[in-house]
């Protein structure tokens, strides 16, 4: 086991902390590390003593505290740099795929982000682990050290991360023509208060934000929850309710007459950003370049 200290912290202890967080329990971490559970417990306690902080909540699954998140992020960054160095030196294991974890919002996944992955050169040898999360919350996964990069609506960089604007995703207030004729025939502020609405999940605030722009406290309480981007759009096209549809998904359905934009002057733009660890990592650099190129081709400037 490598025990060289980084900034005074023994790497075996930091790696053990990461294993406990990833595996969820001390016993599972011991199995993954091929050591005894007592060795895992001793390493974590030694690290907590060295830092003077409680690093884990002893729950099931185990969760890092705010201080623990800093060290989890450190452990993942060290692992990333080790794999890059191994690949550059052609050492044993250099041919193994490199795993890159990214947090992405559902609408980006459904419209443009997968295209970015196909732009990454195959010789980079990357395997992607995507975590779907609302664009307002993806930065939290970066902060926790759960992912290396994220598509986020936040322009404020997470500590230790760089940020660049990708472009604007436009959302259009849409409904099926039949639904619009039945429920949306009148001033938007009046009809939106009563018309059934489709929302992604209970954290989806897009439709309520649209209603607030019209001077309403929220959209109708008659709402359908459809927690996939494709299903959300299909539910609106099927006439279940109205909703804010990403422009790339709305365009073909508007052209086909399956959707109508019932308030064209009230589109909503969300500026998306790319945040990633501030590391000199070829793997992250290749992904960031592909993401920027695809976003430029898909999103509004």
Positions of predicted regions on the chain:
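Hydrophobic two-helix hairpin corresponding to the core of helix-turn-helix DNA-binding domains
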Residues: 17, 29-30, 65-68, 239
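Short helix-boundary/capping micro-motifs
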Residues: 18-34
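A short LG(V/I)-centered, amphipathic sequence patch enriched
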Residues: 48-66
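Alpha-helical linker/hinge and terminal dimerization helices associated
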Residues: 50-51, 71-93
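Central regulatory/effector-binding core of bacterial HTH transcription factors
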Residues: 95-159
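Hydrophobic hinge/microswitch elements
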Residues: 137, 217-262
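Secondary-structure junction motif
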Residues: 193-217
């Amino acid at each position: 086991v490598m025990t060289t200290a980084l900034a005074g912290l023994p790497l075996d202890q930091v790696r053990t902390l990461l294993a406990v967080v990833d595996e969820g329990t001390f016993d599972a971490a011991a199995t993954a590390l091929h050591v005894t559970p007592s060795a895992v417990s001793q390493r974590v306690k030694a690290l907590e003593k060295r830092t003077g902080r409680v690093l884990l909540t002893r729950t099931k699954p185990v969760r890092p505290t705010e201080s623990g998140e800093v060290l989890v992020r450190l452990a993942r960054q060290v692992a990333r740099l080790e794999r890059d160095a191994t690949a550059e030196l052609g050492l044993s294991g250099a041919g193994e795929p490199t795993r890159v974890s990214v947090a992405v919002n559902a609408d980006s996944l459904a419209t443009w982000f997968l295209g970015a992955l196909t732009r990454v050169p195959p010789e980079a040898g990357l395997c992607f682990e995507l975590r779907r999360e609302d664009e307002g919350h993806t930065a939290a996964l970066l902060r926790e050290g759960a992912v290396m990069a994220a598509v986020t609506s936040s322009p404020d960089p997470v500590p230790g991360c760089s940020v660049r604007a990708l472009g604007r995703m436009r959302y259009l207030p849409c409904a099926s023509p039949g639904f619009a004729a039945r429920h949306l025939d009148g001033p938007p502020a009046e009809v939106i208060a009563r018309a059934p609405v489709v929302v992604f999940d209970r954290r989806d605030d897009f439709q309520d934000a649209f209603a607030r722009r019209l001077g309403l406290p929220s959209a109708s309480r008659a709402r359908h929850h459809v927690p996939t981007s494709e299903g959300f759009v299909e539910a609106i096209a099927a006439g279940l309710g109205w909703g804010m549809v990403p422009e790339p998904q709305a365009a073909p359905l508007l052209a086909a007459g399956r959707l109508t934009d019932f308030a064209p002057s009230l589109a909503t733009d969300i500026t998306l950003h790319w945040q990633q660890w501030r590391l000199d990592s070829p793997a992250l650099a290749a992904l960031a370049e592909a993401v920027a190129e695809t976003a430029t081709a898909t999103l509004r400037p």
